[in-house]
Curated annotation (Swiss-Prot):
The gene is UBL5. PANTHER family: UBIQUITIN-LIKE PROTEIN 5. CDD domains: Ubl_UBL5 (cd01791). GO terms for biological process: protein modification process; RNA splicing. It comes from Arabidopsis thaliana. Coiled coil: none annotated. One of its GO terms (cellular component) is nucleus. Gene3D superfamilies: Phosphatidylinositol 3-kinase Catalytic Subunit, Chain A, domain 1. The keyword DNA damage does not apply. Residues 1-73 form the Ubiquitin-like domain. This is Ubiquitin-like protein 5. The lineage of its organism: Eukaryota, Viridiplantae, Streptophyta, Embryophyta, Tracheophyta.
Amino acid sequence: MIEVVLNDRLGKKVRVKCNDDDTIGDLKKLVAAQTGTRAEKIRIQKWYNIYKDHITLKDYEIHDGMGLELYYN
């Protein structure tokens, strides 16, 4: 179980606990449950890398305590 911190740069930080074999799509659903926005409207990225929904957190080497950027489409 890892904890990922997502910052939307509008003053909101979301902390989500998930497994490292979860996909980015699963992470979006967990974030959507906490923020109240739809999962389809969420984009997760780090610098200029936009993460795709079907790839796991382990494949992207996302580890415990890592900070990601949260954008709303």
